[in-house]
């Protein structure tokens, strides 16, 4: 499944099938919270959180692709991410875009 952040795919014509999205919510565990608290004191990147957010994005993309496949799409255009905190220890990530089907010339 081709996924692009642009509106057009050079050399391709397509019909729009509709919006697709994938979402995941991940929680921070106790050990990560302790490590993050220490990093907050001394400064620097909190690698466990960075890894968690990267993994969450990958899960959201895969779920979005699955929804597009179920709609019969060949690609997703205008893909974007959104994320936010839920309560204090949870992070939600959504990947969304427009599912399209290629038109043969």
Swiss-Prot record:
Q: Which InterPro entries match?
A: UPF0145_dom_sf, UPF0145_YbjQ-like
Q: What SUPFAM superfamilies is this protein classified in? A: YbjQ-like (SSF117782)
- Disulfide cross-links: none
Its family remark reads:
Belongs to the UPF0145 family.
Query: Could you tell me what this protein is called?
Result: UPF0145 protein LSL_1614
């Amino acid at each position: 499944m081709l996924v692009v952040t642009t509106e057009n795919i050079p050399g391709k014509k397509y019909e729009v099938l509709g919006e697709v999205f994938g979402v995941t919510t991940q929680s921070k565990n106790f050990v990560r919270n302790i490590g993050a608290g220490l990093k907050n004191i001394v400064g620097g990147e909190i690698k466990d959180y960075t890894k968690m957010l990267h993994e969450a994005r990958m899960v959201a993309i895969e779920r979005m692709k699955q929804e597009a496949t179920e709609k019969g799409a060949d690609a997703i255009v205008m893909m974007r991410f959104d994320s936010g905190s839920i309560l204090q220890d949870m992070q939600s990530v959504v990947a969304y875009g427009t599912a399209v089907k290629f038109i043969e010339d």
